[in-house]
UniProtKB/Swiss-Prot annotation:
InterPro entries: YshB (IPR047812). This is Uncharacterized protein YshB. It comes from the Bacteria. The lineage of its organism: Bacteria, Pseudomonadati, Pseudomonadota, Gammaproteobacteria, Enterobacterales. It comes from Escherichia coli (strain K12). Induction: In stationary phase (at protein level).
Length: 36
């Protein structure tokens, strides 16, 4: 589950080229992984 989220985040970061969005997505994925 978490690996697929990370893959989506990394692919989205490459597409958008916006570090802030990538960082926010990584933090959200990390929180989801911790609390799930």
């Amino acid at each position: 589950m978490l690996e697929s989220i990370i893959n989506l985040v990394s692919s989205g970061a490459v597409d958008s080229h916006t570090p802030q969005t990538a960082v926010a997505a990584v933090l959200c994925a990390a929180m989801i992984g911790l609390f799930s």
